[in-house]
Amino acid sequence: MPAMGTALPRAMASTASVSTSTGSSELSSLSDNINNPADISVIVIYFVVVMAVGVWAMVKTNRSTVGGFFLAGRSMTWWPMGASLFASNIGSGHFVGLAGTGAATGIAVTAFESHSFALLLVLGWFFVPIYIKAGVMTMPEYLRKRFGGKRLQIYLSVLSLFICVILTISADIFSGAIFIKLALGLDLYLAIFILLAITAVFTITGGLASVIYTDTLQAIIMLVGSFILMIYAFVEVGGYESFTEKYMNAIPSVVEGDNLTISPKCYTPQPDSFHIFRDAVTGDIPWPGTAFGMPITALWYWCINQVIVQRCLCGKNMSHVKAACIVCGYLKLLPIFFMVMPGMISRILYTDMVACVVPSECVKQCGVDVGCTNYAYPMLVLKLMPMGLRGLMLSVMLASLMSSLTSIFNSASTLFTMDLYTKIRKKASERELLIAGRLFVSVLIVTSILWVPIVEVSQGGQLIHYTEAISSYLGPPIAAVFLVAIFCKRVNEQGAFWGLMVGLVLGLIRMIAEFSYGTGSCLAPSSCPKVICGVHYLYYAIILFFVSILVILGVSYLTKPIPDVHLYRLCWSLRNSEEERIDLDAEDREENEADARTEEDQTEKPRGCLKKTYDLCCGLQRAEPKLTKEEEEALKKKLTDTSEKPFWRTVVNVNVIVLLAVAAFFYGYFA
């Protein structure tokens, strides 16, 4: 049996060959399925409608201020916010990754999605009220207000942008490229460039409001399209009972070859395929990791991740924010039916390809020697759906990819502009900040395209495990800092900084080791030292989280506390304080505001036609009237208001109980 040190380069080379080799004749012919008037018409209509919604949002919304561009002026209602939360989370990586892992191991992977409902409630009821009362636009900005200093803010901003590139953008582009290559037969980089260019147009011109409105449309398309595919898949397989029976017998016809002795467990469906909670030691997703590890990574993703939180910060009021979280919570219970089970059905219908285990056979089927599970969902779309509906499902994949990327681009530009650019250009005017945010999106596009070759050679196995593993190595220390920052006022800057540093080092040790040695497979176990890679990544997330908390609390209690006068409305115990807060970053903010006022006082120069057109597209055409001091105070009060009307507070609280009951039944049935 080859060691992983030699197996990894082989896997990397074969994965890279996807973009250069023709693959099997069957895959090459799949693109012919889309070459018909019905499918092409549906795709064209999709792009026209999405562009129309983007232009409508661009004209309708205020994009000429930082608050309008990045937070939609706190004017969004619950239903587009809820749809945007869902669409921002569900990228093409979910369709490819969840379906692929479902095909390989069963329904346990759905726990990564379904447990999110609880953290969405934590977000709406506990975290967002603090963020709004603090008056922040970004998560690093909250750390600066809470702890003072600049190193935490800069550290978290840089780390968040790094995570955007290696995790979110890379996974979405890789999975989207798989589908687009099969469906359209386009060159990989040409397809990616076109998609990223269209995505960037919405983000650069429209701001957050445009992103949310297009996300709402994308969410509707995703839900309708994936529901139709689910119906077709279950009809084809003969219903649910037939599905459960046939899946357990979906064994590939070729299980020997390449001079390998292949264990039956590598190609036989697992006995616990239809259970979410699995053995604590031998399970691929152990139940303690599901119960305790997943909530930690979900805490980082749903309550601290800029992409998600930014959508909640733009709500009209707290009732709208909570209602949006509830809507998204309901929608997060659907992936098991819309993505995971269709992936399992794909294994039944196309067993020799989706469940291939012999490396040479996998190369013959899909051009990759480490497995073809990532092709489970695209195969269903291209071979099962009739004309017209294939175009609809391609639109679904485009929608999931573009909605996720628009969200990432907008939030990443917010992080760069508000947390990093203002450190470089302290005297930047509001106009300059808006332009800088839009230009940074262009930089992200270039970075994303350059990252594609790295993604190709890194994704030999199941995509969803890659994304969750990276989240488990980088997310827990951030989750620990924000959790104790909000719920323990004794924590100070020194504790938070060293907790993040220790957690980052431990996380990078595991992540770099896995990149170096590989994660292994059923055929070739990893040669990574057991002391580093011997525990499941979800268990490692638990260890990271509690080590970070111990360091944060230990250092904080050994150093001076932050006086309460700096913490009013920044932590839970002081959330309702009426006293005036003296921000730890007050001097920096006053200096920046004075510099901004100096530039804004300059007279506006006459503009030509080209300049006016450019300003119209970028939301810079209207010079907002200067607010009086009273108007500034009123605006600040609106942006930091967390009050609710009693009736609507009761309505959302009742809906929480209903959601919890539905989720309890869901887990009780599938556990």
Curated annotation (Swiss-Prot):
GO terms for molecular function: D-glucose:sodium symporter activity; low-affinity D-glucose:sodium symporter activity; proton transmembrane transporter activity. InterPro entries: Na/Glc_symporter_sf, Na/solute_symporter, Na/solute_symporter_CS. The chain crosses the membrane at residues 39-59, 66-86, 90-110, 117-137, 160-180, 182-202, 219-239, 289-309, 325-345, 379-399, 435-455, 468-488, 495-515, 538-558, 651-671. One of its GO terms (cellular component) is plasma membrane. GO terms for biological process: D-glucose transmembrane transport; proton transmembrane transport; sodium ion transport. Keywords: Cell membrane, Membrane, Transmembrane, Transmembrane helix. Its main location: membrane. Residues 594-604 have a biased composition (Basic and acidic residues). It is found in: Cell membrane. It is a multi-pass membrane protein. Disulfide bonds: none annotated. Residues 1-38, 87-89, 138-159, 203-218, 310-324, 400-434, 489-494, 559-650 are cytoplasmic. Residues 583-604 are annotated as: Disordered. Residues 60-65, 111-116, 181, 240-288, 346-378, 456-467, 516-537 are extracellular. Residues 583-593 have a biased composition (Acidic residues). NCBIfam families: sss. Generates D-glucose-induced depolarization in a pH-dependent and Na(+)-independent manner, with activity in acidic conditions (pH 5) but not neutral conditions. Belongs to the sodium:solute symporter (SSF) (TC 2.A.21) family. This is Solute carrier family 5 member 4. It comes from Rattus norvegicus (Rat). The gene is Slc5a4.
